[in-house]
Amino acid sequence: MKEHVLNQKKAVVEEIKGHINDAKSMVIVDYRGLDVSEATELREKFRNENVLFKVYKNTMMNFAFKELGFEGFLDYLSGPNAVAFSMDDPIAAARIAKEFAADHENLEIKAGYLGDKFLDVEGVKKIASIPSREVLLTKMLGSFKAPVSKFVYLADAIAKSKAEGSEETESNETTETVEE
């Protein structure tokens, strides 16, 4: 093999390893059967969530996975594969792949990686069902807000009942004064 070709292949393997190391998670999908418009739609969905979606030769991914000790993926490297690297939200790649596969039967989720854990298809689907960070933060803030809102409502109700009680006392005193 010519040296420049070998260097190009080594560069691709290094690129894959770099993406794996930089990503918070990764999902491998079989995109066989997607037409151009569907593939474009999928790429756009990934891009909007800062998920890098790349197609590499299986042999290049094989070398990268072996060098990083990701032997669990080697069994999934057959057919046309693409890899989605989630750079920000660790759930984004899995969530987008799962949602897209639900509407497009030609996209097949094969495996994934989150943190230091290999995920089979079921594992990818499970993490895909976890709400996004923003949704979880909103729910958490809502749970903090609810007791405070109830306390404010209760304090307001007590203040109103005391105000009504003092008005009744004043009106009773006025009535007694008029009667005398």
From Swiss-Prot:
GO terms for molecular function: large ribosomal subunit rRNA binding; structural constituent of ribosome. Transmembrane segments: none annotated. Keywords: Ribonucleoprotein, Ribosomal protein, RNA-binding, rRNA-binding. InterPro entries: Ribosomal_uL10 (IPR001790), Ribosomal_uL10-like_sf (IPR043141), Ribosomal_uL10_bac (IPR022973), Ribosomal_uL10_bac_type (IPR047865), Ribosomal_uL10_CS_bac (IPR002363). One of its GO terms (biological process) is translation. Residues 166-180 have a biased composition (Acidic residues). It holds the Pfam family Ribosomal_L10. The keyword rRNA-binding applies. The keyword Ligase does not apply. Residues 161-180 are annotated as: Disordered. GO terms for cellular component: large ribosomal subunit. Belongs to the universal ribosomal protein uL10 family. Part of the ribosomal stalk of the 50S ribosomal subunit. The N-terminus interacts with L11 and the large rRNA to form the base of the stalk. The C-terminus forms an elongated spine to which L12 dimers bind in a sequential fashion forming a multimeric L10(L12)X complex. Forms part of the ribosomal stalk, playing a central role in the interaction of the ribosome with GTP-bound translation factors. NCBIfam families: PRK00099.1-1 (NF000955). This is Large ribosomal subunit protein uL10.
